[in-house]
Every structure is written in C-alpha cells, then in structure tokens.
C-alpha cells in the first residue's frame, strides 16, 4: 500500500512524514509512505495526505503552479484522503484570506476569527488561535477509534471552516464560540488542527487513517 503526502512546498512536511511513518508502525502496516510533488505519482498512491501551512493564496498558487490541483481533485473522488490545516481549508469553496477560491469539495467558506475576541472571563483572546484545545466529536467516524471525547489537539490558525452542510461537521472546538474543526464526506476527512503536532492523539488519528 502506498500513501502519498502531497509536497507543493507549503507545509511542515518532514514533521508530517515522520508522524505518518510512526503511525504506520503503530498500525502494523506494510505501507510505503512518501512525499511527492509529482501528480502522476500521487495519482498512483492508494491514500493521500494533504498538509498545508501558510497563507491560503500562496498555497493555492503553489498547488496550481505545480499541476497538483487536478491530482488532488482526482484523489478526492475515490481515495482515502486526509486534509490537514490549510490543506483542509483548501477543500472549501472560498476563503476570506486573500479572497481565494478553493477546490470546492466542501460547500462553504473559510472565515477569519473576529478581532477583539473575549473568553468567558472577559479576557482578550489572541488571533491566531495557537495551542492545545479540546475537540468534541459530533458524529461517529472510524478515525475517532481509540480517541476519547474532548481530547486535546494542537491548533495554529487565524481562519476556520464554515461549512454549508452541518452534516459534514464531525468535530468542533471553542474559541470562544464553537467552530467546526473536523469535517468529512465519503472518503475525505479533514482537520483544522495539526495531527503531526498533537502527540499520541494525533498519531492515533493517523494510524486510524492508514487502517481506513
């Protein structure tokens, strides 16, 4: 089995690669895990992981420039697919960041957290939302196996998903209001948080993906 981590020059790729390889060992899978910016090699993979880090306009431009946008669209149709952070945001119709169109797999927009956010005690919250936060699983999913409700994951983001269809929301967090942080549809699963930075919980989720 081959799992491709898409390399379009935008993301914490070697950290993702290391985490996915560790997850493969935990899963006991004989799986080849590799970075690739080659659309043909991505198209031959059995599973695809789509990380991303940085500004969405830059990520979308890099993806298109490398000819990987069509490979991603094809993978979304028929392969187990995991989007991470900006890689997840790129799956939506549109982002407020740079007024950027995405790939349109999920209906909805990516919105910026408002300025002057306050926590329940009236203290100012910083944007970007950075650090550990609990995640509520709002639906059952195979990738949640072995992960308790309200497990903490690691976030770094100024923008968040606003899906059109609430049935695609699989998990939520609060900052300070609830926002979608996991979405899924058919063969596609995507998280706003960084699984590769989320220690045991992130490794378990990646292991579940390799077993999916």
Curated annotation (Swiss-Prot):
Source organism, top-level taxon: Bacteria
Subcellular locations according to the entry: Cytoplasm
Pathway membership: Amino-acid biosynthesis; L-histidine biosynthesis; L-histidine from 5-phospho-alpha-D-ribose 1-diphosphate: step 5/9
Entry GO MF terms: glutaminase activity; imidazoleglycerol-phosphate synthase activity; lyase activity
Catalytic reaction annotation: 5-[(5-phospho-1-deoxy-D-ribulos-1-ylimino)methylamino]-1-(5-phospho-beta-D-ribosyl)imidazole-4-carboxamide + L-glutamine = D-erythro-1-(imidazol-4-yl)glycerol 3-phosphate + 5-amino-1-(5-phospho-beta-D-ribosyl)imidazole-4-carboxamide + L-glutamate + H(+); L-glutamine + H2O = L-glutamate + NH4(+)
Gene Ontology biological-process annotations: L-histidine biosynthetic process
Protein task: IGPS catalyzes the conversion of PRFAR and glutamine to IGP, AICAR and glutamate. The HisH subunit catalyzes the hydrolysis of glutamine to glutamate and ammonia as part of the synthesis of IGP and AICAR. The resulting ammonia molecule is channeled to the active site of HisF.
Name listed for the protein in its UniProt record: Imidazole glycerol phosphate synthase subunit HisH
Gene source species: Neisseria meningitidis serogroup A / serotype 4A (strain DSM 15465 / Z2491)
